[in-house]
Amino acid sequence: MVLIRVLANLLILQLSYAQKASELIIGGRPCDINEHRSLALVKYGNFQCSGTLINQEWVLSAAHCDGEKMKIHLGVHSKKVPNKDKQTRVAKEKFFCLSSKNYTKWDKDIMLIRLDSPVKNSAHIAPISLPSSPPIVGSVCRIMGWGTISTSKVILSDVPHCANINLLNYTVCRAAYPELPATSRTLCAGILQGGKDTCVGDSGGPLICNGQFQGIVSWGSDVCGYVLEPALYTKVSDYTEWINSIIAGNTTATCPP
């Protein structure tokens, strides 16, 4: 069994805000207010995801985060005490490799969102560039998001939590999840000893390896941070040509097979 890391209506009923910084994304710590300028909070109804600002008008997230009347919040740190430079947009257009209803957890869990108007760079808002090359196994990668910070129940953090994990060989995830295909356009990342991981509510957020935006939170173990069960992230470098084509105006561009 695997867990898609989006916060659903049934889970939101268990929602409570974290009171202790020591209740650690899973195993993380509150992010520095200045280290997540490209991180977007994506909300619609009772659902929560994250996204990544890649230029003033475009955000990348996971296809399984798609929803109606989606709002994209930039410049957010504390959800209770908004930054003065917080900016909120809605999705003008959304692009997928597959229908958002037909994505698979093995492949193409990616959504490119065009905002209804550009955001302005500010103290807490700035885009991150697409990767110039694929990541290297063994890289230290940063994860971040407002998802649950407890494995026993859904406890959403008021501020994003950050943690460092390792980029692992894809074969490690195949050993953990035998149903995985021999190859896929995903990255395997985590801590084999367990304890640090993305979790429910972190879907769509970034995996930043050696300063480059390399992955999108997709799915993982039913128990976040479990030993020998790392998570899977959409491999951004495989989609840069498609992303750049869409942004350039070629809305019929096709994704890699």
Curated annotation (Swiss-Prot):
Top EC class for this record: hydrolase
Protein name, per record: Thrombin-like enzyme KN-BJ 2
Residues bearing glycans: N102, N169, N250
GO MF terms held by the record: serine-type endopeptidase activity; toxin activity
EC number(s) stated in the UniProt entry for this protein: 3.4.21.-
Main location: secreted
GO terms for cellular component: extracellular region; secretory granule
Family as reported in the entry's similarity comment: Belongs to the peptidase S1 family. Snake venom subfamily.
Lipid metabolism is among the record's keywords: no
Gene Ontology BP, a term: proteolysis
